[in-house]
């Protein structure tokens, strides 16, 4: 009887453990607790202390949601444009129906870094239409014009579709389809190289046992597309590039400076373990650089002593990298005081020369 009692206790403990793992995959106290336990030995590896984070304020959208993620910034003279998406994940449907890009603007005062952003229009720039949801907007300049790319996820004849809109006279043009794939093709990142506009997109897969809940994901490759005309109405596939690093790219942003391609990205590190030996699959903030745009070296340490990092974006000024990043709702107690589901945007700065890269 004693053995049976012990076995029942073990079984009960195992059931409770599985339940906690399942519940901790969603925003809440258990996820916050799991993040704290998993990352306590790894957050200290970052370069910048999280006390240096300036938290940004965004106006409510028309539905009253302040849960902001997927930021993309464009510095235009003394103005900063930001496109970001509400992401109220605590809603019953996960909030995907609200994940549509909105335009915000901040006025840059002297050399101050902007942290307050006002809605330009209280309506989304585009709607999901036939897709399951919109995601991953990216703002950029091309031939003195302002454009927005948005990724549509899961349509009737595609897994990912990239649409393009031009911002003219405070109005957005009707979207046109420029890229369509049956791959993940996540988070388009734009680089202008002479007469070519390169679009980098990330392909990753969830690991086994519903890995995004418990184990994580793996970056399979990054695909590159190029424009075929100046009007940006036609793009062609260029190549896949391998990603052999332990830091797995999830969302990112790119820029070119002084002969190097730079990729700022959030991602887990498969070499990171918890103190009890399990993989730490929470995401940190990284940067990689490349001379040819194909072979990248990744920084040795995360840029900031904080896990729970989501989509980053940045601008470079006087070799100071000004980084904006969304949180991934894993800081339940702290971030939810400000934003319902814990998705908000922070900012910090780091000198580009202070970052060391792996060989």
Give each language-model segment a name.
Residues 15-21:
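Alpha-helical transmembrane segments
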Residues 19, 29-132, 140-250, 255-307, ...:
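Beta-rich carbohydrate-recognition and catalytic domains
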Residues 23-27:
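Transmembrane-helix exit/juxtamembrane "anchor" motif
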Residues 136:
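A short mid-domain helix/strand-loop element embedded in enzyme catalytic domains
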Residues 312-313:
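Exposed aromatic-hydrophobic patches
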């Amino acid at each position: 009887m004693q053995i049976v009692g012990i076995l029942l206790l073990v079984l009960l403990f195992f059931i409770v453990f599985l339940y906690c793992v399942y519940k901790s995959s969603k925003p809440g106290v258990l996820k916050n607790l799991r993040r704290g336990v998993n990352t306590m030995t790894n957050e200290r590896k970052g370069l910048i202390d999280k006390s240096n984070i300036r938290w940004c304020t965004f106006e409510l959208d028309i539905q009253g949601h302040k849960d902001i993620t997927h930021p993309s910034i464009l510095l235009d003279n003394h103005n900063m444009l930001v496109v970001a998406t509400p992401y109220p994940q605590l809603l019953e449907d996960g909030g995907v129906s609200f994940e549509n890009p909105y335009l915000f603007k901040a006025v840059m005062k002297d050399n101050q870094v902007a942290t307050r952003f006002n809605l330009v229009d209280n309506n989304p720039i585009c709607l999901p239409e036939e897709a399951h949801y919109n995601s991953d907007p990216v703002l950029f300049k091309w031939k003195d014009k302002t454009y927005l790319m948005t990724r549509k996820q899961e349509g009737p004849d595609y897994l990912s579709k990239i649409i393009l809109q031009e911002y003219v006279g405070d109005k957005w043009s009707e979207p046109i389809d420029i890229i369509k794939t049956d791959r993940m093709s996540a988070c388009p990142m734009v680089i202008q190289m002479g007469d070519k506009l390169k679009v980098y997109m990330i392909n990753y897969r969830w690991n086994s046992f519903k890995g995004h809940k418990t184990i994580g994901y793996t970056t399979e490759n990054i695909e590159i597309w190029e424009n075929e005309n100046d009007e940006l109405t036609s793009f062609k596939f260029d190549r896949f590039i391998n990603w052999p690093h332990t830091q797995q790219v999830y969302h990112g942003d790119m820029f070119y400076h002084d002969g190097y391609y730079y990729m700022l990205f959030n991602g887990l590190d498969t070499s990171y373990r918890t103190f009890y030996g399990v993989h730490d699959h929470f995401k940190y903030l990284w940067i990689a650089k490349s001379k040819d745009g194909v072979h990248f070296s990744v920084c040795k340490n995360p840029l900031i002593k904080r896990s729970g990092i989501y989509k980053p974006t940045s601008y470079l000024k006087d070799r100071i990298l000004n980084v904006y990043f969304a949180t991934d709702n894993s800081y339940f107690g702290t971030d939810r005081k400000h934003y319902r589901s814990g998705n908000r945007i922070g900012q910090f700065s780091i000198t580009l020369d202070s970052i060391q890269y792996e060989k």
